[in-house]
């Protein structure tokens, strides 16, 4: 197994890292969703085209590229719709007529698609609701997975679409979306491609978590070296050293599972991503909680990135059922 990045992959990592470093530091991390202008700028850099399948006009980047980009997003604690809008919805429309209408706009960052599981077709119209649709308030259209498992595309401007805003724990906005007899365009997605899309979205989430873990650990180590108690840096106390070492262990175990999932063969990727999700979400939450503890009361304030990072990790670790759902899937 080759764990080294290719020259092209290293260029992508460095590009994303520089872009985020210009916009985020410890005072701005996770202070709110990425602005539409910054999202479009990433599209102009070709990042979304890289992660979009060739059937939808993209460059067909694979799991390794998803891991690289998502980990950098997580390291900056950037709040973006990458997993759902690009990896799930971008693949849902690939190969269909919807790709002609939405593909370029999605890759350029000019339009946002949101994934909305819920609802049912009744007399050829979509009825029902989808709860907690991430970025649902800003979505131009919805990729809906009905209760029967069919994929449909719904125009967000349809008069039968009703949205109620919901603020999530990390400060980002979601929506409760109701579909009242709306027109829905069927999406024909090969079963293998949809399973791959779900795996890549899951991979993106755990990669974000690993990036966030690395950032929170770095911030914590810097803090305990600077914070003095009894005339010494608290980093000199053995109990603090042991706690930081435990955080590092959680990070490295998580990174190993992430690499295994990203480098798995396509037929084994779904299970490898599920195994990563079964561990990484819980490990990330423990690391974030430990980071808050080592910062003391300041760790839960908005002045420091640590508390905001905890809230971001809390959300990511619970998406799509989190570790509980992943462990249940492995046991099935």
Descriptions of predicted regions:
Residues 130-135, 156-186:
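Flexible, small-/acidic-enriched active-site or ligand-binding loops
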């Amino acid at each position: 197994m080759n764990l080294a990045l290719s020259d092209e992959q290293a260029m992508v990592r460095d590009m994303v890292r520089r872009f985020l470093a210009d916009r985020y530091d410890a005072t701005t991390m996770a202070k709110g969703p990425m602005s539409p202008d910054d999202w479009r700028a990433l599209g102009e850099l070709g990042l979304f085209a890289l992660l979009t399948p060739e059937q939808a006009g993209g460059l067909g980047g694979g799991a390794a590229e998803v891991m690289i980009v998502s980990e950098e997003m997580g390291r900056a604690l950037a709040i973006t719709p990458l997993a759902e809008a690009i990896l799930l919805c971008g693949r849902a429309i690939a190969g269909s007529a919807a790709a002609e209408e939405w593909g370029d706009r999605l890759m350029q960052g000019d339009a946002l698609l949101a994934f909305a599981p819920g609802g049912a077709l009744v007399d050829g119209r979509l009825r029902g609701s989808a709860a907690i649709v991430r970025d649902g308030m800003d979505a131009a259209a919805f990729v809906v997975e009905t209760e029967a498992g069919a994929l449909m595309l719904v125009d967000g401007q349809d008069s039968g679409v009703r949205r109620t805003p919901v603020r999530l724990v990390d400060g980002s906005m979601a929506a409760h979306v109701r579909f009242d007899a709306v027109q829905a365009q069927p999406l024909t997605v090969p079963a293998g491609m949809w399973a791959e899309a779900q795996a890549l979205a899951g991979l993106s989430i755990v990669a974000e978590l690993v990036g966030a873990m690395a950032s929170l650990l770095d911030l914590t180590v810097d803090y305990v070296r600077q914070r003095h108690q009894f005339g010494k840096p608290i980093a000199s106390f053995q109990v603090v050293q042991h706690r930081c070492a435990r955080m590092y262990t959680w990070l490295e175990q998580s990174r190993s599972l992430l690499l295994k999932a990203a480098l798995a063969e396509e037929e084994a990727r779904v299970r490898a991503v599920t195994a990563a999700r079964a561990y990484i979400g819980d490990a990330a939450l423990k690391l974030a909680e430990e980071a808050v503890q080592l910062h003391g009361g300041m760790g839960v304030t908005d002045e420091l990135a640590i508390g905001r990072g905890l809230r971001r990790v809390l959300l990511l670790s619970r998406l799509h059922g989190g570790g509980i759902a992943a462990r249940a899937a492995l046991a099935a």
